[in-house]
Design a protein with these regions (language model features):
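C-terminal charged capping/lid subdomain of soluble metabolic enzymes
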Residues: 303-376
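Carboxylate- and glycine-rich phosphate/diphosphate-binding segment that chelates Mg2+/Mn2+
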Residues: 147-253, 360
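C-terminal catalytic subdomain
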Residues: 253-311
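Glycine/threonine-rich beta-strand-loop-alpha-helix active-site module
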Residues: 73-175
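Fold-independent oxyanion-binding glycine-rich loops
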Residues: 7, 13-14, 36-37, 66, ...
């Protein structure tokens, strides 16, 4: 069994105000700071940024105004912006896309090659500049992962730069920073965490240790969403822990059909990744259950029956209620119905057979069609 963790995590209310000290600990003297444009109006973020700039007067600032997930072309442009001023480290503050952008910039600044040449799992690359991540949304897990997602516009596919050298050196998680985010974004990010937990839990490559993280991450996130009190810092910390656990489990096992569906639908319709995954998650779980997979019972600590089958059915019932509570849509608003479900199933199957292979029961194009029909 193999298992890896890498990023130092600091989590707590107001911890982002201590960011200058955490940056100093990495021996940065001229940090490049990338931050989400939608944070600009946050008074708390302004206080964080003021502290950084006061401590590091020659900081290089970049406001990321790019909408949606970054492209390789955008990565090239941002890297060139920073290359002119030669920062000695990167601090990325924002949602998952901005954190991934920070990983890409940190790597490209020490590897003067086209960004597209690093897509996939690049080998023999130089170490990146040290990176500190500060998430403003909790669920993508980008703050602690080595994966950095980028879109290849020519192919219309979501790929990435996935080197273990991408691991952030530190991640500073402060629930206060997420408090001004729109609630729909908070929920979509939390659903992304649930997808990571479920896909990794059922993955053929799971280990006993990865499953501990899958279960803990699922329960923290699921019950925070169920309670409907996401305006509380304590609930946001549960989402933060769920995000860390889910992504750690995913890195140490593998994904499944839900993540695959989300990648395809998200790129095609520019849907936030977490919401795209949420659309499919429950129906993939139900498909697996109908095929005899009842191990989801382990995710349900409040089960009223010792029967794994009954406990899984009970959990799926709770999922139904959560979806109603959160108003998670089906595929109809995105133009899908019975008439084009087969085409969507075929396209997803052609693009993402690797994700399908991770499912705990056989999952193929016919399976995808079944799931999609139930969502139209």
């Amino acid at each position: 069994m193999q298992f890896f963790l890498s990023t130092d995590v600091i989590a707590g209310v107001n911890e982002a105000l201590n960011l200058p000290e955490y940056v100093r600990q990495l021996a940065m003297k001229k940090p490049g700071i990338i931050y989400d444009a939608n944070l600009s109006s946050s008074l708390y973020f302004q206080e964080i940024l003021k502290g950084l700039v006061s401590r590091f007067g020659n900081s290089v600032l970049f406001c990321n105004e790019f909408k949606g997930e970054p492209t390789y072309a955008h990565l090239e442009n941002v890297t060139e912006f920073f290359r002119r001023d030669a920062p000695d480290g990167i601090v990325a503050i924002g949602g998952g896309s901005t954190l991934d952008l920070g990983k890409g910039v940190a790597l490209l600044l020490t590897n003067e090659v086209p960004a597209l040449s690093l897509k996939g799992f690049p080998q023999d690359v130089n170490d990146p500049l040290p990176l500190v991540t500060v998430p403003s949304l909790l669920g993508s897990g980008a703050e602690i992962s080595f994966n950095a997602v980028f879109i290849d516009e020519a192919q219309g596919r979501k790929l990435g730069i996935n080197s273990r050298k991408n691991f952030p050196k530190k991640s500073v998680i402060d629930p206060q920073l997420s408090m001004t985010a729109p609630m729909e974004s908070v929920i979509a990010s939390a659903m992304d965490s649930l997808v990571h937990c479920i896909d990794s839990f059922g993955s053929h490559k799971h280990t006993p240790l990865s499953r501990i993280f899958s279960v803990e991450g699922f329960q923290r996130t699921f019950y925070a969403l169920q309670q409907g009190q996401l305006d509380r810092a304590e609930s946001r910390l549960d989402l933060a822990i769920g995000s860390i656990c889910g992504t750690t489990a995913l890195m140490n096992s593998g994904d499944g059909p839900t993540n695959g569906f989300a990648y395809y639908l998200g790129v095609k319709h520019k849907i936030p990744h977490g919401l795209a995954g949420a659309i499919f998650l429950k129906e993939v779980m139900r498909y697996n259950f109908d095929k005899g997979y009842d191990k989801y019972a382990l995710l349900n600590p409040m089960r009223s029956s010792p029967s794994a089958k009954d406990a899984t059915a009970e959990l799926l019932g709770e999922m139904d209620e959560l979806y109603r509570q959160l108003d998670i849509p089906d595929l109809v608003p995105y133009g899908y119905g019975q008439g084009n479900a087969a085409e969507l199933a075929r396209n997803v199957s052609d693009a993402l057979t690797g994700s399908f292979a991770g499912n705990p029961v056989e999952f193929n194009e016919d399976s995808a069609r079944h799931v999609i029909y139930n969502l139209t």
